Amino acid sequence: MEVKVGIGDYAVAKKTGIISTYGLGSCVGITLYDRLNRVGGLLHALLPESARYGGRGNPAKYVDTGLELLIKDMMKLGASPRRLEAKLFGGAHMFTNVSNENLMVGKKNVEVAKRELKKRGIRLVAEDTGGKGGRTIYLDVSTGKVRMRKVSNGKVIEAVF
């Protein structure tokens, strides 16, 4: 069974299934996985920090508060925060004519994701971030592997992390 995660959303599962998200541009997709209990989760975050944007609306649309929700729901399924491994995708620079640091949301999303993972003691084991193209990712909850598809310079690239 495949669960599709939209922008500003997340999903968790135990032992089986695929959790996917499409269209990661400047957004980031963060997968977390507990190998021992085979609990996985995926967050598709739109913006870096809730406080920076007034904390309005859905907390899952922000990297910092969305990650907190993801971890809590994974713990309900038996995951241990000490065993979580993270993989990070997205954070593309979608608007090449923008050079203002404050408007480079993709770069900031990646920075905040790494900071929040480190703050929680979660090891980042793989990433594919930056660039100018979108990505689609699929987390296989039975193995923890993430399959990624992206378009770069007109070519479709697939990789497994």
From Swiss-Prot:
Catalytic activity: L-glutaminyl-[protein] + H2O = L-glutamyl-[protein] + NH4(+)
Entry keyword set: Chemotaxis, Hydrolase
A family per Pfam: CheD
Protein name: Probable chemoreceptor glutamine deamidase CheD
Keyword RNA-binding listed: no
Any GO BP: chemotaxis
MF annotations from Gene Ontology: protein-glutamine glutaminase activity
Native source species: Thermococcus kodakarensis (strain ATCC BAA-918 / JCM 12380 / KOD1)
UniProt function note: Probably deamidates glutamine residues to glutamate on methyl-accepting chemotaxis receptors (MCPs), playing an important role in chemotaxis.
InterPro entries: CheD-like_sf, Chemorcpt_Glu_NH3ase_CheD, Cytotoxic_necrot_fac-like_cat
Family: Belongs to the CheD family.
Protein EC: 3.5.1.44
Lipid metabolism found in the keyword field: no
